[in-house]
């Protein structure tokens, strides 16, 4: 189909170039027009067939052998050479053979065939595009074919002077044409050819003139709902509809009053609706558009094209309330998520507490089995403080077994001590320890856990330096005390320095 259309366009362009190079004489055009006018008076001769006649002096090339389609109303159409054309059989417009032989136009007419090879009266093949002209109301259609807006040849009615008047779309047209045969650019080229012929003034004006419509303006697009017949690569035709936008504005603004007074009678305005503050979009629907209307829009059409102001405000309030509820739900969900996190933290804290309790119980078990030695029982018997009664709850060795390790440290056996205790009426844990196990008395002139007594040894000086460094004295004073400590030599001086240092620290 595409190759056939491309060939039609190519042949048409070659014909136009040939016409530009060697225009057809006006005499030949006049004879052809006269023959076409006779055909309009004799419809019975419309389908007569003739053999091809060779061109006498027109000079048209072979691709320019175009078929001139017949019209029942007398308006011809230029057709390109189709795929179903025959070299032997030609379609004419009722023109007798003698007229063709006598004429010098060299135009040859052919049959127009459909894809099945049958001659057709009108263009009914699948790739035809039939467009309604919509320009003249009194134009009639023949066999369901519409007038094309891009018609190639229109014949007007002759005026009183005998010249043709171009009246595009006024003649009834039944023959269609292929949209791929003649493009928009070809229309402009034909107009250029006619303009050159009119400037030459070499041709006398006859009863008929060739009229080609101007190229269509792409800016002037029709928005009316006009059916368009399109090709579907078959013998069927698909009908589309050009419709405007389905959505229109809501509320119409009030128009200002015109300052000029109307010249004619005024129109009644009793049915004009009142102005509204706001309105929803109106959904327009036509059965030809192929669209469907939702039940909501049908209910709106039944109840009115516009929403009520109060109903619209109520809907807005409901939307706002729903948005608020959604926001509150989001806040609640976020709080619940935080509670779930806290619950997990509480569970982990409980587990840690249980572990600590287990550790404490373990430590208590270990402490109950440890023996603790208490000093103070290894005193010299000659010491005046040896006879002082000590707390009876304190024992030399504390353990689960009260008599444990006593036999090893006491002078008397355990059995004798138990018998002696029974005779005295109470059990006594006191006993005389062996000399090797007795603690030596604490010397007052020696350093011990009770107190520090400085001497001339390096250990005493190190202890004093540590006391100075760990004190809260200023750094300058610390450095000064360090220098004094290095200068002290004797034990008495070192003891006095220690006492002075302790007084400074205790302040």
Swiss-Prot record:
Region (Disordered): 42-91, 133-163, 201-227, 252-273, 285-307
Region (Interaction with the L polymerase): 361-377, 396-410
Region spans: Multimerization: 304-376
Keywords from the named record: Phosphoprotein, Viral RNA replication
Phosphoserine: residues bearing it: 86, 151
Annotated Polar residues bias: 286-301
Region described as Interaction with the nucleocapsid (N-RNA): spans on this chain: 459-507
UniProt region (X domain (XD)), positions on chain: 457-507
Biological process (GO), any one: DNA-templated transcription
Record field: compositional bias (Acidic residues): 144-160
Pfam families (UniProt xref): Paramyx_P_V_C, Paramyxo_P_V_N
PTM per Swiss-Prot/TrEMBL: Phosphorylation on serines by host CK2 is necessary for the formation of viral factories.
GO molecular function, one term: RNA-directed RNA polymerase activity
Quaternary structure (record): Homotetramer. Interacts (via multimerization domain and XD domain) with polymerase L; this interaction forms the polymerase L-P complex. Interacts (via N-terminus) with N0 (via Ncore); this interaction allows P to chaperon N0 to avoid N polymerization and non-specific RNA binding before encapsidation. Interacts (via C-terminus) with N-RNA template (via Ntail); this interaction maintains the P/L complex anchored to the nucleocapsid template during the sequential transcription. Interacts (via C-terminus) with protein C this interaction allows C to associate with the ribonucleocapsid.
Protein role: Essential cofactor of the RNA polymerase L that plays a central role in the transcription and replication by forming the polymerase complex with RNA polymerase L and recruiting L to the genomic N-RNA template for RNA synthesis. Also plays a central role in the encapsidation of nascent RNA chains by forming the encapsidation complex with the nucleocapsid protein N (N-P complex). Acts as a chaperone for newly synthesized free N protein, so-called N0, allowing encapsidation of nascent RNA chains during replication.
UniProt domain comment: The N-terminus consists of a long intrinsically disordered tail. The central part contains the coiled-coil multimerization domain (MD). Forms a four-stranded coiled coil structure. The C-terminus constitutes the alpha-helical domain (XD) that binds to the nucleocapsid (N-RNA complex).
Protein name: Phosphoprotein
The organism's taxonomic lineage, starting at the top: Viruses, Riboviria, Orthornavirae, Negarnaviricota, Haploviricotina
């Amino acid at each position: 189909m595409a190759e056939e259309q491309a060939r039609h366009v190519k042949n048409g362009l070659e014909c136009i170039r040939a016409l530009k190079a060697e225009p057809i004489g006006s005499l030949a055009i006049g004879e052809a027009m006269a023959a076409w006018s006779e055909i309009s008076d004799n419809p019975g001769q419309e389908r007569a067939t003739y053999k091809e006649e060779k061109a006498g002096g027109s000079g048209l090339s072979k691709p320019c052998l175009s078929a001139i389609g017949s019209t029942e109303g007398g308006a011809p159409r230029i057709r390109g050479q189709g795929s179903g054309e025959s070299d032997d059989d030609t379609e004419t417009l009722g023109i007798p053979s003698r007229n063709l032989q006598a004429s010098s136009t060299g135009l040859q007419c052919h049959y127009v065939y459909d894809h099945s090879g049958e001659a057709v009266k009108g263009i009914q093949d699948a790739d035809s595009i039939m467009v309604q002209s919509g320009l003249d109301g009194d134009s009639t259609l023949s066999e369901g074919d519409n007038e094309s807006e891009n018609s190639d040849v229109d014949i007007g009615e002759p005026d009183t002077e005998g010249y043709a008047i171009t009246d595009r779309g006024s003649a009834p047209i039944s023959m269609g044409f292929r949209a791929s045969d003649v493009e928009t650019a070809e229309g402009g080229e034909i107009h250029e050819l006619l303009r050159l012929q009119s400037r030459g003034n070499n041709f006398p004006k006859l009863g008929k003139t060739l009229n080609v419509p101007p190229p269509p303006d792409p800016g002037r697009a029709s928005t009316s709902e006009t059916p368009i017949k399109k090709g579907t690569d078959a013998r069927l035709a698909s009908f589309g509809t050009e419709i405007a936008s389905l959505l229109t504005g809501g509320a119409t603004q009030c128009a200002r009053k015109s300052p000029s007074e109307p010249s004619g009678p005024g129109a009644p305005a009793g049915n004009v609706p009142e102005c509204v503050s706001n309105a929803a979009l109106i959904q327009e629907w036509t059965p030809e558009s192929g669209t469907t209307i939702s039940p909501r829009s049908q209910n709106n059409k039944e109840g009115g094209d516009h929403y009520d102001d109060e109903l619209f405000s109520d809907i807005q309030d409901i939307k706002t309330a729903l948005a608020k509820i959604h926001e509150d739900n989001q806040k609640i969900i976020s709080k619940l998520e935080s509670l779930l996190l806290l619950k997990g933290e509480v569970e982990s804290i409980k587990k840690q507490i249980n572990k600590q309790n287990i550790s404490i119980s373990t430590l208590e078990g270990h402490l109950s089995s440890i023996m603790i030695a208490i000093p103070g029982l290894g005193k010299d018997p000659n010491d005046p403080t040896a006879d002082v009664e000590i707390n009876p709850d304190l024992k030399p060795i504390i353990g689960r077994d009260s008599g444990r390790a006593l036999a090893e440290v006491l002078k008397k056996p355990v059995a004798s001590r138990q018998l002696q205790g029974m005779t005295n009426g109470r059990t006594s844990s006191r006993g005389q320890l062996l000399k090797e196990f007795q603690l030596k008395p604490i010397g007052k002139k020696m350093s011990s856990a009770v107190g520090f007594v400085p001497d001339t040894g390096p250990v005493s000086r190190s202890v004093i330096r540590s006391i100075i460094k760990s004190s809260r004295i200023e750094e300058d004073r610390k450095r000064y005390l360090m220098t004094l400590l290095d200068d002290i030599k004797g034990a008495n001086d070192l003891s006095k320095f220690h006492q002075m240092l302790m007084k400074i620290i205790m302040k």
